[in-house]
Amino acid sequence: RAMALASPLSPAAWLDDIFASKAAIRGQVIRRKARDIEKFVGRREFERELKRRGFQAVENAGQVIIFCNREPIRRIV
């Protein structure tokens, strides 16, 4: 897995940084570009971290919405 030159953070530090955001700490949702996740940390490692934290995520149109809590997700429409 090659690390992109665009991020000064290691993959672990990048993950720590997004999950240290106010929204994540409060159990809210955060959004990231799918390509940034793949570029900075890798899909497999990202999914492993979500599972470790008990979080869920959905992807649509190149965006990943991360639910920073363990509540069920209910699709409305």
Predicted regions located by residue number:
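General structural signal for secondary-structure boundaries
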Residues: 1, 31-33, 45
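An N-terminal amphipathic alpha-helical segment
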Residues: 1-29
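Long, compositionally biased
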Residues: 5-9, 72-77
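Residues that form generic nucleotide/phosphate-binding pockets
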Residues: 18, 40, 49
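A short, structure-level motif marking secondary-structure boundaries and short turns
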Residues: 25-26, 30-33, 75-76
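Generic recognition of long tandem-repeat/solenoid scaffolds
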Residues: 30-35, 63-67
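Short, compact, well-ordered microdomains
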Residues: 44-76
